[in-house]
């Protein structure tokens, strides 16, 4: 299926100089896959070749592709003529509740990706913290309340239909007002699980105890800049900044925050650490 699908693309765009070269590529690819010398990612298995081999087109699902002839972005007219073969996507989210690109729209965009077996990661640092003022009056319910909605949405979707669950990464900058709650999110949920298990509920991951609590459908990471480590070395205070106006909402000891990150990672394997400054220093396409 995969080999034939790739062969169709090779013929369509004349990637090889001769038919013999194309046949050699096909034969070597099929041999390599059958002997597990190389295998593609999961979405390739799920999606690629369904149209070419079985004639399955599927309804359009809001995907886009770049036409190689015109170099223009076009909306896909079916699900599998231009399938979703990539394993990982990065989505942004605006500090907006219901408009396109905002929080509720993100769950729809994630669902589209999960449906075809791919994973998604998002940095949620743009969303204002609990208690920050809203433009229409009142104050924000905070980031954590929305993360729990996204967690439930991801848990309701088994990526790829019947093959795998949603793959989801949640990132947060270390100066977000709710960083401490985020760091300890899974720690607190694991305490609830332990209490439920002690009360007689099964301990397996698909059991009622884990289905009851939140935070079980993503891997979480904190974005750590170099200036945090400088503050840590100096045993200084770390400022948590409002997303709406940049003011300092709270000050915590850098060492205390670092200790909580390490304890949480030991206790429940989250959050991971992403070294923001170093990652961007090594960025090969900083203007991209």
Regions found by a protein language model. Give the residues of each.
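Extended catalytic cores of very large enzyme megasubunits
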Residues: 1-288
């Amino acid at each position: 299926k995969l080999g034939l699908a790739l062969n169709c693309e090779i013929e369509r765009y004349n990637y090889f100089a001769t038919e013999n070269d194309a046949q050699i590529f096909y034969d070597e690819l099929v041999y390599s896959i059958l002997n597990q010398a190389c295998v593609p990612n999961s979405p390739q298995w799920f999606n690629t070749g369904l149209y070419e081999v079985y004639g399955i087109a599927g309804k359009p699902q809001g995907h886009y592709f770049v036409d190689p002839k015109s170099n223009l972005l076009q909306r896909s007219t079916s699900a599998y003529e231009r399938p979703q073969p990539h394993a990982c996507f990065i989505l942004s989210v605006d500090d907006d509740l219901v408009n396109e690109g905002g929080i509720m729209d993100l769950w729809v965009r994630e669902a589209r990706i999960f449906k075809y077996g791919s994973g998604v990661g998002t940095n949620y640092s743009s969303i204002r913290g609990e208690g920050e003022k809203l433009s229409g009056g009142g104050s924000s319910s905070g980031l954590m309340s929305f993360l729990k909605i996204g967690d439930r949405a991801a848990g309701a979707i088994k990526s790829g239909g019947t093959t795998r669950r949603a793959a989801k990464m949640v990132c947060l900058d270390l100066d977000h007002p709710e960083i401490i709650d985020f760091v300890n999110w899974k720690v607190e949920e694991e305490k609830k699980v332990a209490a439920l298990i002690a009360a007689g509920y099964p301990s397996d991951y698909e059991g009622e105890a884990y289905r009851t609590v939140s935070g079980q459908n993503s891997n979480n990471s904190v974005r750590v800049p170099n200036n945090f480590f400088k503050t840590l070395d100096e045993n200084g205070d770390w400022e948590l900044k409002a997303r709406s106006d940049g003011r300092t909402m709270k000050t915590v000891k850098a060492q205390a925050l670092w200790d909580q990150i390490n304890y949480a990672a030991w206790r429940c394997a989250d959050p991971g650490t992403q070294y923001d400054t170093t990652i961007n220093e090594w960025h090969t396409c900083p203007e991209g």
